[in-house]
A protein has these predicted regions:
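Short amphipathic alpha-helix that is part of the acyltransferase structural core
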Residues: 1-36
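Acyl-donor binding region in acyl/amide transferases
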Residues: 12-15, 56-160, 170
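Conserved beta-hairpin
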Residues: 25, 38-55
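A short, aromatic/hydrophobic, helix- or strand-capping loop or linear motif
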Residues: 35-38, 196-198
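Short beta-strand micro-motifs in enzyme catalytic cores
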Residues: 39-41, 75, 164-168
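A conserved mid-domain beta-alpha-beta active-site/ligand-binding segment of alpha/beta enzyme cores
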Residues: 157-180
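Short, cationic low-complexity segments
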Residues: 180-219
Length: 219
């Protein structure tokens, strides 16, 4: 079996079990919640697992239909968690780029950069050739003591506006003809990449940190 990233500065990207991704998701990622996980891949540096990326079904059926319509709603996956503990240059894009090669073909991969909430631009997606399709629409979420309320009896007065996010889409394809077909079905416009300062958070105090730049613009 070919291992993506083999002999590339000691880095490898390999499939991992869901349980191997959980410590990264629950203890490091700012959301601190476990999403739907259909595929998980790890970044190994000199044999040590230092990061993971997970893909799963989008949380909302409307996301699936919104990408390319009813016909392709089952072809949509979401890159829903990306966690790197070794922030060395290009590790994040190396992990994402190589994991995309391991996913099933002829799928739409949607992911979001939380620009309004966390100051994320999405340079890792730009570096791995995702298509930029604009900002999501803002809408209100229901919360109870700061947590999403998934039960009946929602207090309509206890609602907050969800941050709009930059939406990125990648198409895995089996051949160029299929890529053209899937691209034609895409329901969002393809726009120029956004630029600007991007920020990350302190793992012990996950709030946006303006002064810390993670990915820098090169082009």
């Amino acid at each position: 079996m070919f291992l993506y990233g083999e002999n590339t500065k000691g880095r490898r990207v390999l499939p991992i079990e869901r349980r191997d991704a959980l410590p990264f998701i629950l203890n490091i990622h700012y959301a601190r919640r476990v999403p739907s996980i259909s595929y998980a891949y790890g970044l190994f540096i000199d044999g040590k697992l230092v990061g993971c990326v997970t893909y799963g079904s989008p949380a909302s059926p409307s996301i699936c239909k919104g990408v390319a319509g009813e016909e392709h709603r089952k072809d949509v996956l979401e890159l829903n968690r990306l966690v790197i503990t070794d922030p060395s240059k290009n590790n994040a894009s190396f992990l994402v780029g190589n994991s995309l090669k391991l996913l099933p073909k002829n799928k739409y991969i949607v992911s979001y950069a939380d620009y309004e909430g966390w100051g994320h631009i999405g340079y890792v997606y730009q570096a791995t050739n995702f298509l930029f399709t604009g900002l999501t629409n803002g809408h209100k979420d229901n919360f109870n003591n700061g947590k999403h309320n998934r039960h009946n009896g929602i207090d309509l007065n206890n609602r907050v506006m969800r941050n709009r996010k930059y939406r990125y889409i990648y198409i895995t394809y089996s051949d160029k003809r299929k890529r053209r077909e899937l691209l034609k079905a895409l329901r969002y416009p393809v726009l120029k990449y956004p630029k600007g300062e991007t920020r990350h958070y302190d793992l012990n105090n996950p709030k946006p940190c303006k002064e810390i730049e993670v990915f820098s613009e090169k082009n």
